[in-house]
Amino acid sequence: MKLGRAALALLLLAPCVVRAVEPISLSLALAGVLTTYISYPRLYCLFAECCGQMRSLSREALQKDLDNKLFGQHLAKKVILNAVSGFLSNPKPKKPLTLSLHGWTGTGKNFASKIIAENIYEGGLNSDYVHLFVATLHFPHASNITQYKDQLQMWIRGNVSACARSIFIFDEMDKMHAGLIDAIKPFLDYYDVVDEVSYQKAIFIFLSNAGAERITDVALDFWKSGKQREEIKLRDMEPALAVSVFNNKNSGFWHSSLIDRNLIDYFVPFLPLEYKHLKMCIRVEMQSRGYEVDEDIISKVAEEMTFFPKEEKVFSDKGCKTVFTKLDYYLDD
């Protein structure tokens, strides 16, 4: 998370946006500044991003981005496309949209959240209205969990007050201290208003490795049965995935009221990636760097990756996460 775009702009026109790394005292000071420019929204928007400037979501553009940038994830792409486009087209949603993305490292969870943000705000993850929390960075100490709960509620309340269509992304949910995330339960529930603030248009996205074993088991069973992974349906995954995450003591969702009260709209499985998907990632990366696609280099990079299970060697250990650094070695030759 970042501070203001410039010190001068912050002093003159500072929006009431509370950053995860900002002191709470700063947010209180900014509330006073708000009154000096509240009557001049057009003037303010000449200098900084405004909530009202959010993009009008194009379902076709979102689908194109998902198809061109997210590989091997037919379930995730369908759920994200329908959930996000449907939510944003609803002028009066009953509750915030909550997506919980699950899968191994390198399968595309962070990338999917980036795509969502970019299709709603031009600045994407750098937008003033998109807020990223990383469990090990922002909530490192179990002894401070009570303080974290209070701060988290204040940060979310302040940001949604400034922009109803705020997006909150919680990464490393599997490393978050159990019970902490329950602090935001009132904001995710079916309330019109909580303490004079409506959260119904906000979006909450949770990213986690929890449940990845269950996802792999289903994908491997389909592979052993000679079925295509595209035949896997959400119903084959979602119920067992929710139970697995709820009962995982190493997950921030362990016995969470968010799951118990059915406040997570979708548990989105990200399947482990196969050899062919790694080649897709490498191919797109070469194109994005302006290199001519070289299938020989693509194959060499993909073959350097390690695969599991030990016997079958079907799925990439790290997904597409490290293929880009390995690509550097061959491009420098």
UniProtKB/Swiss-Prot annotation:
What GO annotations for molecular function exist for this entry? ATP binding; ATP hydrolysis activity; ATP-dependent protein folding chaperone; cytoskeletal protein binding; identical protein binding; kinesin binding; misfolded protein binding
Reported consequences of knocking out the gene: Animals fail to feed or vocalize and die within 48 hours of birth. At 18 dpc, the global structure of the central nervous system is normal. However, at the cellular level, nuclear envelope abnormalities, with membranous vesicle-appearing structures in the perinuclear space, are observed in multiple areas of the central nervous system, including neurons of the spinal cord, pons, frontal cortex, and hippocampus.
Residue ranges, annotated region (Interaction with SNAPIN)? 92-252
Predominant subcellular localization, coarse grouping: endoplasmic reticulum
GO BP term, pick one: wound healing, spreading of cells
Enzyme Commission identifier(s):
3.6.4.-
User: Positions of the region Interaction with SYNE3?
Assistant: 313-333
Which residue stretches belong to region Interaction with KLC1? Answer: 252-333
Membrane topology, as annotated = Peripheral membrane protein
Post-translational modification remark? N-glycosylated.
Listed binding positions for ATP are G103, W104, T105, G106, T107, G108, K109, N110
Name the GO cellular-component terms: cytoplasm; cytoplasmic vesicle membrane; cytoskeleton; endoplasmic reticulum; endoplasmic reticulum lumen; endoplasmic reticulum membrane; growth cone; nuclear envelope
One Pfam family named in its UniProt record: TOR1A_C
Tissue expression summary: Widely expressed (at protein level).
Catalytic activity field: ATP + H2O = ADP + phosphate + H(+)
Q: Which UniProt keywords are present, listed alphabetically?
A: ATP-binding, Cell projection, Chaperone, Cytoplasm, Cytoplasmic vesicle, Cytoskeleton, Endoplasmic reticulum, Glycoprotein, Hydrolase, Membrane, Nucleotide-binding, Nucleus, Signal, Synapse, Synaptosome
What subcellular locations does the record give? Endoplasmic reticulum lumen; Nucleus membrane; Cell projection, Growth cone; Cytoplasmic vesicle membrane
Q: What does the UniProt record say this protein does?
A: Protein with chaperone functions important for the control of protein folding, processing, stability and localization as well as for the reduction of misfolded protein aggregates. Involved in the regulation of synaptic vesicle recycling, controls STON2 protein stability in collaboration with the COP9 signalosome complex (CSN). In the nucleus, may link the cytoskeleton with the nuclear envelope, this mechanism seems to be crucial for the control of nuclear polarity, cell movement and, specifically in neurons, nuclear envelope integrity.
Quaternary structure, per UniProt, is: Homohexamer. Interacts with TOR1B; the interaction may be specific of neural tissues. Interacts (ATP-bound) with TOR1AIP1 and TOR1AIP2; the interactions induce ATPase activity. Interacts with KLHL14; preferentially when ATP-free. Interacts with KLC1 (via TPR repeats); the interaction associates TOR1A with the kinesin oligomeric complex. Interacts with COPS4; the interaction associates TOR1A with the CSN complex. Interacts with SNAPIN; the interaction is direct and associates SNAPIN with the CSN complex. Interacts with STON2.
Which PANTHER family does this one have?
A: TORSIN (PTHR10760), TORSIN-1A (PTHR10760:SF15)
Which family does the UniProt entry place this protein in? Belongs to the ClpA/ClpB family. Torsin subfamily.
Q: What is this protein called?
A: Torsin-1A
Gene name per UniProt: Tor1a
